[in-house]
Curated annotation (Swiss-Prot):
Keyword hit for Magnesium: yes
InterPro entries to which the protein is assigned, alphabetical: Hyethyz_kinase (IPR000417), Ribokinase-like (IPR029056)
Protein's name in the database: Hydroxyethylthiazole kinase
The UniProt record lists the keyword Kinase: yes
Example GO biological process: thiamine diphosphate biosynthetic process
Alphabetical keyword list: ATP-binding, Kinase, Magnesium, Metal-binding, Nucleotide-binding, Thiamine biosynthesis, Transferase
NCBIfam families from the UniProt entry: PRK09355.1, thiM
Top-rank taxon, per record: Bacteria
Pathway: Cofactor biosynthesis; thiamine diphosphate biosynthesis; 4-methyl-5-(2-phosphoethyl)-thiazole from 5-(2-hydroxyethyl)-4-methylthiazole: step 1/1
Matching Pfam families: HK
Gene3D superfamilies associated with the record: 3.40.1190.20
CDD domains (UniProt xref): THZ_kinase
Lineage: Bacteria, Bacillati, Bacillota, Bacilli, Bacillales
Protein encoded by which gene: thiM
Cofactor binding notes: Binds 2 magnesium ions per subunit. The first is coordinated via water, the second is coordinated to ATP but its significance is unclear.
Taxonomic source organism: Bacillus subtilis (strain 168)
Length: 272
């Protein structure tokens, strides 16, 4: 996977406008929907247990986000996930705040046990706590980077869960059971916008809907999103996170194949 291939995935999302079913948290629903629309995908947010299975089976991808979870929402996620699995729809999990409370951590693990996942996207602490590495710092749902080798963590998590792991942060690390890539795009202002990471997970879903290899889809999605964020930060350099948030939506709509080819920094890591 290189910048040129990532750029072509972006074009495929816009060409096919995949339906992304996001069972997400109530803090970020509007921002996520608008971000997917800006990108060129088609969002739907359906939460009721009575309809999630029917919605998931017609979607291009299903995204599960535990940011504001409840027993009922986790049940709905598992119902939707099983339906997606039955119909060949890729499922992406965002274990928001895993490690903050036992209920949150166990909810993420319950979903992983019950649903076959194409990818999991989170920060290092969320991924570490989801797979049982406990010596990482976390505060609420804003997880700290903790300590340790993030590349090794991504490898171990991918092998343990047999899925693509995307750990996002200052440097993004994407791994499957055999390969590891690092990505070097994005901007620090993303950490000042509530829901920027949650939107990114749904963007990964949109790319998984058009690219059958979830590793490549995650790389292309996170690279394209990171480039859009850099361009948005340039445009709002003398302003604050409010202006950046709006400009990020603008740039998700206008970022081009050429932008991604020029700006995306994708490196394959040699692992032993």
């Amino acid at each position: 996977m290189d910048a040129q291939s990532a750029a072509k995935c972006l074009t495929a999302v816009r060409r096919h406008s995949p339906l992304v079913h996001s069972i997400t948290n109530n803090v970020v629903t509007n921002f996520t929907a608008n971000g997917l629309l800006a990108l060129g995908a088609s969002p739907v947010m359906a939460y009721a247990k009575e309809e999630v299975a029917d919605m998931a089976k017609i979607a291009g991808a299903l995204v599960l986000n535990i940011g504001t979870l409840s027993k009922e929402s986790v049940e709905a996620m598992i119902i939707a996930g099983k339906s997606a699995n039955e119909h060949g729809v890729p499922v992406i999990l965002d274990p928001v705040g895993a490690g903050a409370t036992p209920f949150r951590t166990e909810s993420a693990r319950d979903i992983i046990r019950e649903v076959r996942l194409a990818a999991i996207r989170g920060n290092a602490a969320e991924i570490a706590h989801t797979v049982g590495v406990t010596d990482w710092l976390i505060k609420g749902v804003d997880a700290g980077e903790g300590g340790g080798d993030i590349i090794r963590l991504a490898q171990q998590a991918a092998q343990k869960l047999n899925t693509v792991i995307a750990i996002t942060g200052e440097v993004d690390v994407i791994a499957d059971t055999s390969h590891v890539y690092t990505l070097h795009n994005g901007h620090k202002l993303l950490t000042k916008v509530t829901g920027a990471g949650c939107l990114l997970t749904s963007v990964v879903g949109a790319f998984c809907a058009v690219e059958e290899n979830p590793l490549f889809a995650a790389i292309a999605a996170i690279s394209s999103y990171g480039v859009a964020a850099q361009l948005a930060a340039q445009q709002t350099a003398d302003k604050g996170p409010g202006s950046f948030q709006i400009e990020l939506l603008n740039k998700l709509s206008t970022v081009t194949e050429q932008d991604v080819q020029e700006w995306a920094t994708i490196e394959r890591v040699t692992v032993s």
